[in-house]
């Protein structure tokens, strides 16, 4: 396989693992918030506000993974070095 195939596979696996972690984290956060609201409905506003801030922090992981995948695909800093090594 050539360099570009490995780049595509790496970006794909990175997005898959990052999205899996983000999805699990958000699911656990929502589960815990709903359990807290079920136990104490009076604190639902405070719990939901805290949950939304937490979800935004968790979602930032997916955004960072996406940015790294785009860098790997389109602005790979090792592309020139690898192509020179492959040409030898």
UniProtKB/Swiss-Prot annotation:
One short Pfam name that applies is: ATP-synt_C
Q: What is its main location?
A: membrane
Record note on quaternary structure: F-type ATPases have 2 components, F(1) - the catalytic core - and F(0) - the membrane proton channel. F(1) has five subunits: alpha(3), beta(3), gamma(1), delta(1), epsilon(1). F(0) has three main subunits: a(1), b(2) and c(10-14). The alpha and beta chains form an alternating ring which encloses part of the gamma chain. F(1) is attached to F(0) by a central stalk formed by the gamma and epsilon chains, while a peripheral stalk is formed by the delta and b chains.
Q: Does the keyword Transferase apply?
A: no
State the family it belongs to. Belongs to the ATPase C chain family.
- The record lists the membrane-crossing segments as 4-24, 53-73
GO cellular component assignments? plasma membrane; proton-transporting ATP synthase complex; proton-transporting two-sector ATPase complex, proton-transporting domain
The membrane-topology field of this record reads: Multi-pass membrane protein
What this protein is called in its record is ATP synthase subunit c 2
Q: Recite the lineage of the species.
A: Bacteria, Pseudomonadati, Thermodesulfobacteriota, Desulfuromonadia, Desulfuromonadales
> Which residue numbers mark the site Reversibly protonated during proton transport?
59
Q: Where in the cell is it found?
A: Cell inner membrane
Q: Which organism is it from?
A: Syntrophotalea carbinolica (strain DSM 2380 / NBRC 103641 / GraBd1)
The keyword Secreted is annotated on this UniProt entry = no
Keywords for this protein? ATP synthesis, Cell inner membrane, Cell membrane, CF(0), Hydrogen ion transport, Ion transport, Lipid-binding, Membrane, Transmembrane, Transmembrane helix, Transport
Describe the task this protein carries out.
F(1)F(0) ATP synthase produces ATP from ADP in the presence of a proton or sodium gradient. F-type ATPases consist of two structural domains, F(1) containing the extramembraneous catalytic core and F(0) containing the membrane proton channel, linked together by a central stalk and a peripheral stalk. During catalysis, ATP synthesis in the catalytic domain of F(1) is coupled via a rotary mechanism of the central stalk subunits to proton translocation.
A GO molecular function term, named singly, is: proton-transporting ATP synthase activity, rotational mechanism
């Amino acid at each position: 396989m050539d360099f570009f195939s490995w780049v595509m596979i790496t970006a794909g696996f990175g997005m898959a693992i990052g999205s899996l972690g983000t999805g699990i984290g958000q699911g656990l956060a929502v589960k815990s918030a709903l359990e807290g609201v079920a136990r104490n409905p009076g604190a639902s506003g405070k719990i939901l506000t805290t949950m939304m801030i937490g979800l935004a922090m968790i979602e930032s992981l997916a955004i960072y993974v996406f940015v790294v995948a785009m860098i790997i695909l389109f602005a790979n800093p090792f592309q020139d070095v690898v192509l020179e090594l492959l040409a030898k």
